[in-house]
Amino acid sequence: MNATQILEYILQEKEKHGISRNKTITEISKTLNLARGTITRWLLLENVPAAYTFDLMKIAGMEIDYSKFDYKQKDQFFTAPDTAQKCYDIFLEKMKEFSVDTSQYLFVEPSAGSGVFLDVLPKEKTLAFDIEPRHKAVQKCDFLTYLPKDDKKYIVFGNPPFGLRGHLALSFINHSGKFADFVCFILPQLFESDGKGSPRKRVEDFNLIHSEKIGNDFEFPDGEKVKVNVMFQIWSKDHKNSKFEIKAHDETKVKVYSLSNGNSPSQQRNTAMIGKCDIYLPSTCFGSENMTCYDSFEDLPNKKGYGIVFNSNKKCYIETASKIDWASVSFASTNSALNLRKSKILEAF
């Protein structure tokens, strides 16, 4: 069964027990931390992203034999030893800044893979899990079902699977919140964004206290090298860093509209503003030369992006926008596409 079939199976089984489709869709959206409309759109288009297969199998109560899926389906890629060491060094430095005694904590590596982080984390104080252990010190366990039965203090540390738009990484963070005081993860650069729908805005119980770009050298389980654009972030329950607080932006001078004009209503957004904006910017594209200002919506890569209206000093703002290096303002996703978010645009002005 594919993801679409599994979702339909769940709905049908719930209906057999007197639970309406609407109620089940609401429950699934909460479990997956998605908008209800997203689930409804999947059903309408009969196209559920394959990345949600494991999530839906768990909801359906299906047994998962991970050996039947390849490493890309499981979103597995391993951290380079020097990257693991750098992350731990950053962590120790930040814990000193916040006067945290790390000797009082146990560490949990939730997706240990080949065990690279076990070489840098305190061996006598680290628990390591993975759905497919590749190291003798790693226990076979689905971290998303793990809850310690004691009241000890925990730090969750590692490189979780990312999932589609970071959905798996978000699940790992939020599950950690049930027992841990800190989460220290390698994450997709999407977690740097504070735009609408950003996984950063859906993190529960934690405050972001540190975030920085790190090396992009990783490895698939078969040894193939891969470049992945990532951040290392530290999230805390009890500490805050004003530098990373999400702030409201002033749109009295600059107004940013998300624009798209697809074939169906679900693919259309703010179409009335198309042709009425002062400049246009891509929301995503490949190649830094394409992440630039456009005079027309029709010229945008994929004909999707942002329209910007300047409420005063139009000539000055347009000139300023043309001089901004939008490629450097954007962030790279794991597939090297450049992404721009509304918050980043407003910050640039």
Q: Which residues make up each language-model segment?
A:
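Class I S-adenosyl-L-methionine-dependent methyltransferase catalytic core
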Residues: 1-349
